[in-house]
């Protein structure tokens, strides 16, 4: 059970806690996964800076804003209310949206790594509230809640970390220059805000990713001859 929760919701400690959570130095192995992006390079779907920005923005709009981000908001609220049934429901729902073995494996392994880290930091919640196979989103929501991060900031932080990871993949595998990556960040910062706004406004019946291309790329990645990343 966590014992060192900050007392000021949304204060400096919360901000620093969020920065820790979204840091690429967080030892959970997120750098090893590309979420199908490496396959998009291999298949010739994404070949340059402009196409990469278009791909990332599409995944943000049709994926994160419809799935990960709204679920993150729901899960953080459920953690705040110690609502184990709702936590279990959305954790299971999230697993069901992972359309390939690699995407499912990524979510489960990152969730397991984050659980281990939180345990080492004495930040785990009541064991009875943790699902048997907690996904990454589920425990990210808890880690933000225990730090008293406001929900909107949690979503923005998660989206930022996801964007940085996608660009890190591109810098290694496309390859993309670091200055080009910064141009994409400048271009897509408003899209992160827009995706967060959309996620917070979505009703339950509006949830679910619409990413057939990403799912196909992820499936093909399983048999890709030469790979740098695990998804």
From Swiss-Prot:
It holds the Pfam family UreF. It is found in: Cytoplasm. It comes from the Bacteria. GO terms for cellular component: cytoplasm. InterPro entries: UreF, UreF_sf. Its main location: cytoplasm. Keywords: Chaperone, Cytoplasm, Nickel insertion. One of its GO terms (molecular function) is nickel cation binding. Signal peptide: none annotated. The keyword Chaperone applies. PANTHER family: UREASE ACCESSORY PROTEIN F. Required for maturation of urease via the functional incorporation of the urease nickel metallocenter. UreD, UreF and UreG form a complex that acts as a GTP-hydrolysis-dependent molecular chaperone, activating the urease apoprotein by helping to assemble the nickel containing metallocenter of UreC. The UreE protein probably delivers the nickel. Belongs to the UreF family. HAMAP family: UreF. This is Urease accessory protein UreF. It comes from Marinobacter nauticus (strain ATCC 700491 / DSM 11845 / VT8) (Marinobacter aquaeolei). The lineage of its organism: Bacteria, Pseudomonadati, Pseudomonadota, Gammaproteobacteria, Pseudomonadales. The gene is ureF.
């Amino acid at each position: 059970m966590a014992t060192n929760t900050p007392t000021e919701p949304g204060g400096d400690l919360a901000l620093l806690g969020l920065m820790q959570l979204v840091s690429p130095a967080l030892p959970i192995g997120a750098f090893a996964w590309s979420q199908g992006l490496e396959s998009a390079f291999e298949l010739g779907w994404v070949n340059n800076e402009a196409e990469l920005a278009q791909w990332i923005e599409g995944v943000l709009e049709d994926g994160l804003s419809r799935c990960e981000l709204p679920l993150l908001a729901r899960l953080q609220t459920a953690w705040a209310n110690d609502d184990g049934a709702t936590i279990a429901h959305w954790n299971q729902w999230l697993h069901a949206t992972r359309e390939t073995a690699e995407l499912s494996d990524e979510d489960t392994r990152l969730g397991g790594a984050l659980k281990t880290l939180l345990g080492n930091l004495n930040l785990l919640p009541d064991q009875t509230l943790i699902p048997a196979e907690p996904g990454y989103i589920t425990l990210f929501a808890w880690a933000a809640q225990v730090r008293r991060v406001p929900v909107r900031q949690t979503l923005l932080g998660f989206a930022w970390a996801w964007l940085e990871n996608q660009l890190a993949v591109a810098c290694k595998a496309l390859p993309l220059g670091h200055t080009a990556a910064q141009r994409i960040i400048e271009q897509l910062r408003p899209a992160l805000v827009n995706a967060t706004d959309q996620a917070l406004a979505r009703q339950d019946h509006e949830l679910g990713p619409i990413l057939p291309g990403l799912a196909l790329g992820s499936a093909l990645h399983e048999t890709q001859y030469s790979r740098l990343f695990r998804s």
